[in-house]
């Protein structure tokens, strides 16, 4: 993942992905590009390209907190959480960071979230878990009702824990999804607590609704 926090221009992503992929020996589709900052400013690629070799050379396993600080814009503090837990007899890790403090509506907007795990999980099972977790966390928060142009939640799983692959819809898969939902919800709450001009943290709970969609409409009315 490569990101910039000066301009929210997402129209230079192919060029950025090509440059990073070439420097790391990857394919373009193995590079995720994210941008946040001022809307409408072109990405200054002429200034970025000469610095990419230096940036790529600084990659390291202990840079998670640096990432959490680097993606801050109007945030007043970094937002990061990391946990480890037993999953079917194997100790696994799950961690992530996020940024966002304003223009958080509707369904994410003006926020980035990067999550990594060493769990070995099929792509479709991970995707389903991510979509469910996002719906119950980042899609359910708002700070000021202002909308924005782009947002991203990325989850990367490398299987480095050495565990046997998770079976779709099995017990370990359900346990991992529960952990992922908890992590995303806590990260989402951290965005609200650090929101621009926020003085209160309010949780709305709807009971007795016939459907989830009905409850959602009532809560967001």
Task: Mark where each language-model region is.
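Single conserved hydrophobic/aromatic residue that forms the stacking wall/gate
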Residues: 1-10
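Short, charged, low-complexity patches
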Residues: 9, 13, 123-130, 173-180
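A structural-propensity feature for long, helix-poor, extended segments
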Residues: 140-156, 188, 202
